[in-house]
Amino acid sequence: MSLISIVCLIPFGLIGAVNPIITLSAYAVLGGMYLFVVPLFLFYWMNNRWNVMGKFERLFIYGLVFLFFPGMVLFAPFLNLRMNGKEES
């Protein structure tokens, strides 16, 4: 990257994009959120609100499930979200 292009990036606060450590750490943080944090939150949300969700909330959650599908598939084999059945007396 030439000196002129680096100088042009300084006013916009994008000089950190030149440093590969900052770039790689940003990728790691965003990838971790995409694959781990948000899918686990979605599993938690769906498990707690499955029977009381409204139609717009359900539509929004299904959209997020579609968006974060790789992370959902990553955790699906390890999480049991089946509802409790009726106990026999």
UniProtKB/Swiss-Prot annotation:
Write out the catalysed reaction: a plastoquinone + NADH + (n+1) H(+)(in) = a plastoquinol + NAD(+) + n H(+)(out); a plastoquinone + NADPH + (n+1) H(+)(in) = a plastoquinol + NADP(+) + n H(+)(out)
Q: Using the UniProt record, name the top-level EC class of this enzyme in a single word.
A: translocase
One molecular function GO term is: oxidoreductase activity, acting on NAD(P)H, quinone or similar compound as acceptor
Q: Where in the cell is it found?
A: Cellular thylakoid membrane
Q: Name one GO cellular component term.
A: plasma membrane-derived thylakoid membrane
- EC number(s) on file: 7.1.1.-
Q: Which Pfam families match?
A: NdhL
Its biological purpose: NDH-1 shuttles electrons from an unknown electron donor, via FMN and iron-sulfur (Fe-S) centers, to quinones in the respiratory and/or the photosynthetic chain. The immediate electron acceptor for the enzyme in this species is believed to be plastoquinone. Couples the redox reaction to proton translocation, and thus conserves the redox energy in a proton gradient. Cyanobacterial NDH-1 also plays a role in inorganic carbon-concentration.
Q: What is this protein called?
A: NAD(P)H-quinone oxidoreductase subunit L
Q: Which organism is it from?
A: Prochlorococcus marinus (strain NATL1A)
